[in-house]
Structures are given as structure tokens and as C-alpha cells.
Design a protein with these regions (language model features):
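Short, solvent-exposed loop/linker segments at the N-terminal edge
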Residues: 225-233, 639-645
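Accessory beta-strand-rich segments of carbohydrate-active enzymes
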Residues: 25, 29, 34-38, 65, ...
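Signal that preferentially marks extracellular ectodomain short beta-strand elements
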Residues: 157-163, 284-300, 681-684
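Beta-strand-rich binding/interaction modules
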Residues: 117, 230-273, 282, 647-669, ...
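Internal, hydrophobic beta-strand segments that form the core of beta-sheet-rich folds
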Residues: 299-310
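Bacterial N-terminal signal peptides
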Residues: 8-16
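Boundary at the C-terminal end of the N-terminal hydrophobic targeting segment
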Residues: 19-21
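Extended substrate-binding grooves/exosites of carbohydrate-active enzymes
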Residues: 45, 55-71, 141, 146-148, ...
Length: 735
């Protein structure tokens, strides 16, 4: 059989299965929305559901704009709405679905959700972007389908026995984004809890005999890898099955591993008698020879695993999952090894919101973030501090990023959140089990007192993670800035968040700290899990000190301090192999419920602005250090107005030694800074008025150039003060 025939047969198989077994139907359009506060519960009987509702599509958050409103004092953002809101949608279940199973899958609803079905919805009509419901009718026929607590993981509810087929039904979703002591995160000050159905929704229609849909909203197929090398790979599939018929059925579970060109790599057929009670598991083993390994960004090769549930010649159900064959290993004091090859862990973190949209992001938004992260040269992403979009994990698989995935057990505890933390960890692992990009499960981040409770719960979460997935690492993160704290070291890896010069000490303290832990904890697996400093591009300062201005009133976050901070921190990290990986905080500015005077309500520690339009100077510092793409960049390009006649000029160049021209005259006096891409030209003299700063370099016959203009006056009324603060006694409190 030729290549074209193989590919055609493969895709015909897929199309046949989709047409006659499982159907997955987008459920994103034609929703109506109403936000509180409400004086009475809308679910009470009566005509309170009548009137005008906003016509919307999901993904949707009601906080897409009010999170951006600036307050006039350092406080919580009082304009940010938290409370109840409702979504409703009418739809007609097809008559052909009668006798099948019907599920609704929500990928993300923040935070507490109740779902109802109504078989006799109110009459309605659309008017100018709204949906108007008939006020003359009584509408109280709502039956509860189910509830979900937690705003970041997917959940599935079965509608099968609650629908009327061939006529209009209505689904109603009640959402509340208030903090509750039983649901993590219990503290909503670190990042905003955007309320709404902010990720896609879909209907799933299956046969009565099916691969499990509602196993914590997972695929129902779990692919485990062991003994992975260039010569062979051992694969185990666990397939969870359900039979809602009244009799047992003799079936075949057929799992096929396909190459990217459609050729069959391996196939396993297992006969199984499926009983009509409970959820049952079928195990299938594969031993592959000469596997094509998943090698991160260098070669993110993905097989496709197609699992079919077959009755005679009929495919009852089918699930398709990715397979990237790889082995992760963290070697203490050496680094991260991917398939026994040392692999650089250039790490960034990412929150899932952006200007004007909040958390209701499109695939195009995710793609833009991924493209920026790839541009900077990052190899690994910490998706903080919660489960993120399924699409984002899928793209990390196909691009080749190494991923740290975690639950939102952050900052504070109530001692009432244990059950929900376990639920969200189980959801995270089962829903993302098959992503080859994920190397570790995050258990907590900066969780403070009480110590005994935090230790106990973290230990339980670690045990749970190891029960769910014995093939990946677990990690916990400390905000106490020390390794040997009682709360630490209850997972495979200890992450440390430390912000030298921002929340405590001076920037250079990072050197002494790294030296000390390298000596005292040489046998520990340690990751520098967060470090960063705020940088507002509208705040510029010619010379900065050794500490930041995080508590300045009004707020003043000069970009230059962040640049200095990152130069020193990355230089230290690079020199200390005790750090098996590191993650700068953050790739992008993100919103925060805590606001400061004279700035928007957000955290400015990102290397890129909240709208993704401006890349700050530190972005190019990392790009020059990490990326294989050519970088030639002059820093302080936004400090145009200057008062220092004699000044350094900093250039980032991964092209070798650059040539610096100031007003056409070459400057030759330079030193190498924190790394070999860091060129600091010293004692450069400016003239009164405009100064043209130009840098040139060449590589492989190609010429590169960067140019900026500075305006110098001895008594420049537009310039910021010459110097910054030298000391700081404030401590990190988890903001």
C-alpha cells in the first residue's frame, strides 16, 4: 500500500468513527447572560427569569472590563464584580440522540457552578444584542443536573435522562466567583477570579456503551510510558469503559499507534466482556522498537493513539490522544535531562489573562502568547497558578515546551479546603495525563501558616499525585525563601520563590544565597521557581539603586530597575547548577485585585505589557541569552531625557563583540557584564541636546544594527532623579 493510500485509509477511519459513534458538538453560541447583584434568587418559582438578558457567546467573563478600572487608593478593586450571574441557552436535542448518552462538558467556569435543565423554557426573541424573555409566562421548571467547585479544571455532567428530544430544552448555569473557605484558591488577592463561562463548552453524544466521558472529565484513556530509549519503548494503555445497556456485551478494544504520515506503528486488539454495572478498566501493552522520541523544541514528534470500542463491525466509540515518547530526569547538581540528553531549562511563567479580555481567551490569543514565549528562547513554562486551557497544553506538546502544571493551592489556608484541593489535583492529572510536555505536578505555591496543616495536606496531595501518576515528578513552592523550612521538602522537587532587592535585601544578595544553598543542599532537587521585579514602561529612571520601589506612594516602577534585577539574577542562575530549572516571574503583566496609587490594577513584573504590544528591556536580555535567533539591542531606549553627561551604554549581543557609535564616534571602552552577551560601554560622554546611540554587529555575512536617541541637558527639567534607593526592609507577603 502506498503512502497516499495509507493516509487516506487512516482519515477515512477517523471520519467514519466520528460520523457513527461519538459526536462532539460545539456549544459556544447563542447564550443569554444576566449579572447580579440580585435581590432575590432567580431560581425561585415565578416570573423573575423574564425580561432582558444580554446575548453573548462563550468564552465569556463578566470581569473583562471592570478588572481594568483604576482605584484612587492602595486597596482591593471595589469595582471588580464578585457574586452571582446566570447563563442560559435553548437547544433542541436531536431525535436521533434518543437511546444514546448525552453529556455537557465545561472546560472552565469560575468559580462555583450549578447547572440546571428546563424542558419548558420561556418564549424569547432577540433584540439589538439582547434576548428578551416573555414576562407573561411563569418559568420555574428547573431541575438540578449537577454542581462543580473550582474555576480552572473541566467538568462533565450527564444530561441523558433529563432531556426531551426533538423540542426546545433550556440549560441554565448559575456561576459565582466569590471566595469560599472550602474551594482553592481561598485567597483571591494574588490574581483575579474572573467570573464566567470563560472557556469553551461542548456537547458529547455517545453510544450507551462507551469509553468513559465523566471520569473527572478526562479522555478515559491513560497512556503510561516506561523504559524509553532510542531502541525501545514500553507503553501501557488503561481504557475506562461503561455499559449502560441491560446486558453484558462481548467487545473488542482496538488501540492503534499511528506515525505522523499515517502509517501504523503498532496495534493491540483485546477482547473484553463488558458488564452492565460500574466502570471497568482494560489494560493494553505495547513494546515499540526504534521509537521516534519527543525531543522538546528540537524535535517534538507526536504519534497519534486511536482507541476504538468495537462491537462486531461497528465502532461504538473512539478516542484520539497524543503520544510523545520521552524520559524526563532531574539530576541533582547537573540539570534536566530529556531522553538522557542534557536539556536547558530556560523558564518563564504565564497567567491566562490579557487587556480587554480577562480570562476569556481565544485560540489566537493562546497562539500569540506561545509565539512570544518561543521568540524569547524559553524552553519550559510554569503555568501558574492553576490548570490552564486544554488547547494551551496541546500546543505545548506540538511545539515542544516542557511544562510545569499546578493547582491553585496558593498563599493562604482555611483548613477547610482539603477535599477540594484533592479534587482539583485529580482533575488536573487525569485531564492532562497524556500530554508529553508535562514533567511535574505542582502541589502548592507560597502556602503559609499554619505549618502542621500545610505539611499534612501537602503530603496527602503528594501521595495522591503519586497514586494517580507514578511516572512524573511532584513539586511544591516555598515563599519562606529558605530550603529547610518545616513546610518544605514534602514533594520530589522544592521550588523557591525569591525576589532579592524587590521584597527583601538588595539585588546582589542572590549571589550569596545561591552560593550558600549550593553548599548546604547539594543533594536536593531545587528549582528557582519565581523571581522578578515590577517594570512600568511609563516609569523611567536614568540610574537605579539596589532595591525596588514596590511600596512607593504613589507607585513608581522604573523599567531600568527590572532590567538590572534580571541581569544580575540570570547571571547568578547560570553560574549555579544547583538550580535544575528556573522560572522568571512573569512573561506578561497580569491583572491583580490589589491596586496601587496612579497605576492600573495589575502586576507589572511581566517582560511584556498586558496588551502584548510592548516588550520591555529585560525581554531582550533573555532573548540574547536564550535564543538562537540573532539579537542586538540597546537598553534604556525609553530613558530619553537625561541629566548625566557621563554614562554607561549597555548592549545585548549574541553576535559577538558589537561596535558602538555615539554621534558617529566609535566607543571602545567596554567590559563584559553578567554573561557573555552583556556588553557595558563605560564612561560614554554625551553632548548637550540630542545624541544618536548606534550599535552594529555582523554574523554569517549579515549586518545588524540598533539605534536610539537620548536627549541630554545638564539641568533637564524632564529627567527623573539621578539615583534610586539603596536599602529596603519590607518583606515579601505573596503579592
Amino acid at each position: 500500500m502506498n503512502f497516499k493510500a495509507i493516509v487516506t485509509l487512516f482519515f477515512l477511519t477517523i471520519l467514519t468513527s466520528v460520523s457513527f459513534s461519538r459526536e462532539v458538538i460545539s456549544f459556544n453560541q447563542n447564550w443569554a447572560f444576566k449579572k447580579g447583584p440580585f435581590t432575590t434568587d432567580l431560581l425561585q418559582y415565578g416570573n423573575v427569569f423574564s425580561g432582558t438578558w444580554q446575548s453573548i457567546a462563550v468564552p465569556h467573563t463578566w470581569n473583562s472590563k471592570d478588572m481594568q478600572v483604576r482605584n484612587d487608593r492602595f486597596t482591593s478593586n471595589e469595582k471588580f464584580y464578585v457574586g452571582d450571574a446566570y447563563y442560559r441557552k435553548t437547544f433542541i436535542p436531536e431525535s436521533s440522540w434518543n437511546g444514546k448518552r448525552i453529556f455537557v462538558k465545561f472546560e472552565g467556569v469560575n468559580t462555583n457552578t450549578e447547572v440546571y435543565i428546563n424542558n419548558s423554557p420561556l418564549p424569547a426573541k432577540k433584540e439589538k444584542g439582547n434576548v428578551v424573555y416573555d414576562a407573561s409566562a411563569i418559568n420555574g421548571n428547573y431541575q438540578i443536573v449537577g454542581r462543580h467547585q473550582g474555576g480552572y479544571s473541566a467538568f462533565v455532567l450527564e444530561l441523558t435522562n433529563m432531556l426531551k428530544f426533538g423540542v426546545e430544552n433550556e440549560i441554565l448555569v448559575k456561576v459565582n466567583n466569590e471566595a469560599t473557605p472550602q474551594v482553592i484558591p481561598v485567597n483571591h488577592t494574588l490574581f483575579p477570579m474572573y467570573g464566567g463561562i470563560y472557556r469553551p463548552v461542548e456537547l458529547i453524544v455517545t453510544d450507551k456503551i462507551n469509553i468513559a466521558v465523566s471520569d473527572y472529565a478526562s479522555s478515559g484513556v491513560y497512556i503510561s510510558q516506561k523504559d524509553i530509549n532510542k531502541k525501545s519503548a514500553s507503553i501501557n494503555l488503561k481504557v475506562k469503559l461503561e455499559n449502560k445497556n441491560h446486558d453484558a456485551r462481548d467487545l473488542q478494544v482496538v488501540s492503534t499507534i499511528f506515525e505522523q504520515n499515517g502509517a501504523v506503528k503498532a496495534k493491540n486488539i483485546k477482547k473484553y466482556r463488558l458488564l452492565p454495572q460500574g466502570r471497568q478498566e482494560v489494560m493494553q501493552d505495547f513494546n515499540l522498537t526504534n521509537p521516534h522520541l519527543w525531543q522538546g523544541l528540537e524535535d517534538p514528534y507526536l504519534y497519534k493513539v486511536v482507541t476504538q470500542l468495537v462491537d462486531g463491525n461497528t465502532v461504538l466509540d473512539e478516542v484520539i490522544q497524543p503520544l510523545g515518547l520521552r524520559k524526563f530526569e532531574l539530576r541533582t547538581g547537573e540539570g534536566f535531562f530529556l531522553n538522557d540528553i542534557k536539556y536547558p531549562m530556560y523558564g518563564v511563567t504565564r497567567h491566562q489573562d490579557r487587556w480587554g479580555k480577562g480570562s476569556a481567551l481565544s485560540n489566537a490569543d493562546h497562539n500569540e502568547d506561545l509565539a512570544i514565549i518561543k521568540e524569547i528562547g524559553a524552553t519550559t513554562i510554569r503555568l501558574a497558578h492553576y490548570q490552564q486551557s486544554a488547547y494551551f497544553y496541546e500546543k505545548c506538546d506540538s511545539i515542544g515546551f516542557i511544562v510545569w502544571a499546578e493547582i491553585p493551592f496558593v498563599n493562604r489556608v482555611t483548613t477547610l479546603e482539603e477535599a477540594n484541593a484533592k479534587q482539583q489535583l485529580t482533575e488536573l492529572i487525569r485531564q492532562n495525563y497524556n500530554h508529553p510536555s508535562i514533567y511535574t505536578w505542582g502541589l502548592h505555591n507560597e502556602v503559609y501558616t499554619p505549618n502542621a496543616y500545610t505539611i499534612e495536606l501537602t503530603t496527602k496531595l503528594n501521595d495522591l499525585a503519586k497514586t494517580e501518576d507514578q511516572y512524573r515528578y511532584t513539586v511544591q513552592v516555598s515563599g519562606y525563601n529558605v530550603i529547610n523550612h518545616a513546610v518544605n521538602n514534602n514533594a520530589d522537587i522544592q521550588g523557591i520563590n525569591h525576589y532579592f532587592g524587590w521584597y527583601n535585601g538588595v539585588i546582589r544578595d542572590v549571589d550569596k544565597w545561591a552560593d550558600q544553598i549550593s553548599k548546604d543542599f547539594k543533594d536536593y532537587k531545587i528549582i528557582f521557581s519565581e523571581y522578578g521585579a515590577e517594570a512600568n514602561p511609563s516609569h523611567q529612571q536614568e540610574v537605579v539603586g539596589d532595591v525596588g520601589n514596590q511600596w512607593a506612594n504613589p507607585a513608581f516602577f522604573p523599567e531600568e530597575f527590572s532590567t538590572k534585577f534580571h541581569e544580575i539574577h540570570w547571571g547568578t542562575i547560570k553560574r549555579h547548577p544547583i538550580f535544575l530549572a528556573s522560572y522568571l516571574w512573569n512573561t506578561f503583566d497580569f491583572a491583580t485585585p490589589i491596586t496601587a496609587l496612579n497605576v492600573e490594577p495589575r502586576n507589572y513584573k511581566g517582560l511584556i505589557t498586558f496588551d502584548r504590544k510592548l516588550k520591555k528591556d529585560p525581554f531582550y536580555w533573555y532573548k540574547a541569552n536564550w535564543s538562537k535567533e540573532p539579537v542586538l539591542y540597546l537598553t534604556q531606549r525609553r530613558v530619553i531625557e537625561r541629566v548625566n553627561e557621563i554614562t554607561p551604554v549597555t548592549v545585548y549581543s549574541n553576535l559577538g563583540t558589537p561596535t558602538l557609535l555615539v554621534n558617529g564616534v566609535e566607543e571602545k571602552n567596554f567590559v563584559i557584564g553578567e554573561t557573555d552577551v552583556h556588553y557595558i560601554f563605560q564612561n560614554v560622554k554625551l553632548k548637550e541636546g540630542d545624541n544618536i546611540i548606534q550599535v552594529k554587529a555582523s554574523s554569517k555575512g549579515q549586518q545588524f544594527e540598533d539605534k536610539i536617541t537620548w536627549h541630554y541637558l545638564k539641568d533637564n527639567p524632564k529627567a527623573i532623579s539621578k539615583d534610586g534607593p539603596k536599602s529596603n526592609k519590607n518583606e515579601h507577603i505573596g503579592l
